């Protein structure tokens, strides 16, 4: 018995520590999955030994106490958390408990929503006006974050309509879309500031700033999902109708909500959301399942820390703990040196992960990482796995320091780091085999010259056998030479030659993008092509002329000039011009186009649901718009889809007009 008491006490101590790190300091040290595992272990032990349950056990409360830096707020209606299920068997057990308690065998209707991975907040409206916003805190006492929440443009300061209750407390999640998170971290790296491990931490850190002006600059947004206090008014008697009422009041509600009757429909919804998860544009960690009928919710009631009528059906963990075995350094297309951690294989989000990016030397220093450390690895959607933290309490005595190389690990050339840049680069250029390989892979990629069948392994063999040194050499290949490659028969070789022949006919924009000029992406390449129309015009441009193009500032202009003036690049382009051609761009006379988009610089952001992004770009361009990839003072209009992030925030900061996709479709039809 003593060993069980000791085990329970150890779990409670550890859980309290991690609750404080997560809920109060916003500095979690372990993945959610590890916390959930420990909590479940403690619950199981307490269930087996109920006499050992204490009032202060982590199983008997929601979270941790708030900091003293903010005014404390007592929740009139406690903000409880949800119990979790992690597989279909556990979900079916929840479904059975609900049916048993209601004493019914009839299929029940559940409202299924996304489980957002952000920070839970309470919004109190009095006579329709936002008077207070608070964090969940420990569920009973939170922190007053009204000044910060008022800076989030998704949250209305006054509710719409006439049927607003005298007092209503709306609950929801503040979160940061992935695009905004990535830009926030990129800016922080450039300035040597704090880099956040994930969007949830970024949202929490942004909301808990003592200076609301800092919060106002962060790309936060909000979805509501429930109500706490209600006084002087009525709500519908089903949860989904409540969500529709919130929407009518002007509160943002996720579109991915569905009524499901019976467990089969619930599980099908869960599987569909798991499949769609990577394309949402923001982080979720599961699906929330609620009995839709509010009368039935009242009958089911609550346990100590959670409602009986709801559960969170969580996805496989996106973060796991493993150990760093070694660190290697890879060389990219532009010479960027990227440290990569070789890991003890671990399953993350359903995939075995054995490698993870460490980004650069600054990131290694920020993490305080050493070889042999136990680390937290994160994999979200299609994002390359990355190390987001070190578990210092598990550091062994024999860890080794990571030494960043001074010479390229592939070609031996010096590595340099330009002042103000986080990335170190090999100076070998196309002398470096690694850079040659990556430049060629980019040149033949789908959005560049789109050489069908020319995969990475073929490029690697072509370089290793010294058949190809630069993009122009690709068009000198013969079927006979290609049959000398591994797994390349005569038919495959002929198909590849045919694909190369087809790739000779392209567009000026694709050609510029294929060259791989630093920081010239698809949008910038398209803008350069539209502005200069010919390669000769582009070659003749000076810095100031280049800077007049949308998306092109001082840095990009210098990259373009340096690339086009480099002797080796000039020779390669001359050879390519002999074989690659594109039609003369049609001159679009903006004055002759009767369209609200004519002559306007337009930026698309967020997820579009009616048109694909490429379709939207094509239709806007056809009506005389210049579609840019970034927001600046030159931007005339921003079209914001779902989960728009930092670009929307910047547009609002600069006072640029913003419309949604529906308005864009309407204007396209004019």
Swiss-Prot record:
In alphabetical order, the GO MF annotations are: DNA binding; DNA ligase (NAD+) activity; metal ion binding
Q: Which reaction does it catalyse?
A: NAD(+) + (deoxyribonucleotide)n-3'-hydroxyl + 5'-phospho-(deoxyribonucleotide)m = (deoxyribonucleotide)n+m + AMP + beta-nicotinamide D-nucleotide
Q: Which Pfam families match?
A: BRCT, DNA_ligase_aden, DNA_ligase_OB, DNA_ligase_ZBD, HHH_2, HHH_5, Nlig-Ia
- Enzyme Commission number(s) of this protein: 6.5.1.2
Look up the record and report any one GO term of the cellular component aspect. cytosol
Residues at which NAD(+) binds: 32-36, 81-82, 113, 136, 173, 290, 314
- GO BP terms: DNA repair; DNA replication
Cofactors per UniProt? Mg(2+); Mn(2+)
Q: Which keywords does UniProt give here?
A: DNA damage, DNA repair, DNA replication, Ligase, Magnesium, Manganese, Metal-binding, NAD, Zinc
Q: Which CDD domains match?
A: BRCT_DNA_ligase_like (cd17748), LIGANc (cd00114)
Which family, according to the similarity comment?
Belongs to the NAD-dependent DNA ligase family. LigA subfamily.
Entry function: DNA ligase that catalyzes the formation of phosphodiester linkages between 5'-phosphoryl and 3'-hydroxyl groups in double-stranded DNA using NAD as a coenzyme and as the energy source for the reaction. It is essential for DNA replication and repair of damaged DNA.
Q: Which HAMAP family match?
A: DNA_ligase_A
* The protein, known as: DNA ligase
Its source organism is Yersinia pseudotuberculosis serotype O:1b (strain IP 31758)
């Amino acid at each position: 018995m003593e060993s069980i008491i000791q085990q329970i006490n150890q779990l409670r101590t550890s859980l309290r520590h991690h609750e404080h790190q997560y809920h109060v300091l916003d500095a979690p040290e372990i993945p959610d999955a590890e916390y959930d595992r420990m909590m479940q272990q403690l619950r199981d032990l307490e269930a087996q030994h109920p006499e050992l349950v204490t009032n202060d056990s982590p199983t008997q409360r929601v979270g941790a106490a708030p900091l003293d830096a903010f005014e404390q707020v007592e929740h009139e209606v406690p903000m409880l958390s949800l119990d979790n299920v992690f597989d279909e068997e556990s979900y079916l057990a929840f479904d059975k408990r609900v049916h048993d308690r209601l004493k019914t065998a009839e299929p029940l209707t559940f409202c299924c929503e996304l489980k957002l991975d952000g920070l839970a907040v309470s919004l109190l409206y009095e006579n329709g006006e936002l008077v207070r916003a608070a964090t969940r805190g420990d569920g009973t006492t939170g922190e007053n974050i009204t000044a910060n929440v008022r800076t989030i443009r998704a949250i209305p300061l006054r509710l719409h309509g006439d049927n607003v209750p005298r007092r209503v407390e709306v609950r929801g999640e503040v979160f940061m879309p992935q695009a905004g998170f990535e830009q926030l971290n990129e800016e922080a790296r450039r300035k040597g500031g704090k880099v956040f491990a994930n969007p949830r931490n970024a949202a929490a850190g942004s909301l808990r700033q003592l200076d609301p002006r800092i919060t106002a600059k962060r790309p936060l947004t909000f979805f509501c999902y429930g109500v706490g206090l209600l006084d002087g008014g009525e709500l519908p008697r089903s949860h989904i109708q409540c969500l529709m009422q919130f929407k009518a009041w002007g509160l943002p509600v996720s579109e991915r909500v569905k009524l499901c009757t019976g467990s089969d429909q619930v599980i099908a919804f869960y599987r569909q959301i798991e499949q769609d998860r990577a394309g949402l544009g923001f982080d979720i960690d599961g699906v929330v399942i609620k009995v839709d009928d509010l009368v039935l919710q009242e009958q089911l009631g609550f346990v100590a820390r959670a409602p009986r009528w709801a559960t969170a059906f969580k996805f496989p963990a996106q973060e796991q703990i493993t150990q760093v075995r070694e660190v290697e350094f890879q060389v990219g297309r532009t010479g960027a040196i990227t440290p990569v951690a070789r890991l003890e294989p671990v399953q993350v989000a359903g995939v075995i992960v054995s490698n993870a990016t460490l980004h650069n030397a600054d990131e290694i220093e920020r993490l305080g990482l050493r070889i042999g450390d136990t680390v937290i690895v994160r994999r979200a959607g299609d994002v390359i796995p990355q190390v987001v933290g070190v578990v210092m309490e598990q550091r062994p005595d024999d860890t080794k320091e990571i030494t960043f190389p001074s010479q390229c690990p592939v070609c031996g050339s010096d590595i340099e780091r330009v002042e103000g840049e986080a990335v170190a680069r090999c100076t070998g250029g196309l002398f470096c085999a690694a850079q040659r390989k990556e430049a060629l892979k980019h040149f033949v990629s789908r959005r560049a010259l789109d050489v069908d069948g020319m995969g990475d392994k073929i490029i690697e063999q072509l370089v290793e056998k010294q058949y190809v040194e630069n993009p122009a050499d690709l068009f000198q290949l013969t079927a006979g030479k290609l049959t000398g490659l591994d797994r390349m028969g005569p038919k495959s070789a002929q198909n590849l030659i045919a694909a190369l022949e087809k790739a000779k006919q392209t567009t000026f924009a694709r050609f510029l993008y294929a060259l791989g000029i630093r920081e010239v992406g698809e949008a910038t390449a398209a803008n350069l092509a539209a502005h200069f129309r010919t390669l000769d015009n582009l070659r003749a441009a000076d810095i100031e002329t280049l800077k007049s193009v949308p998306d092109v500032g001082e840095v990009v202009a210098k990259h373009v000039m340096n690339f086009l003036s480099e002797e080796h690049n000039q020779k390669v382009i001359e050879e390519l011009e002999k074989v690659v051609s594109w039609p003369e761009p049609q001159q679009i006379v903006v004055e002759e186009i009767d369209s609200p988009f004519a002559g306007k610089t337009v930026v698309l952001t967020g997820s579009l649901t009616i048109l694909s992004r490429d379709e939207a770009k094509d239709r806007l361009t056809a009506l005389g718009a210049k579609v840019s990839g970034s927001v600046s003072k030159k931007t005339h209009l921003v079209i914001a889809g779902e989960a728009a992030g930092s670009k929307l925030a910047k547009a609002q900061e600069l006072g640029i007009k913003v419309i949604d996709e529906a308005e864009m479709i309407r204007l396209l039809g004019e």
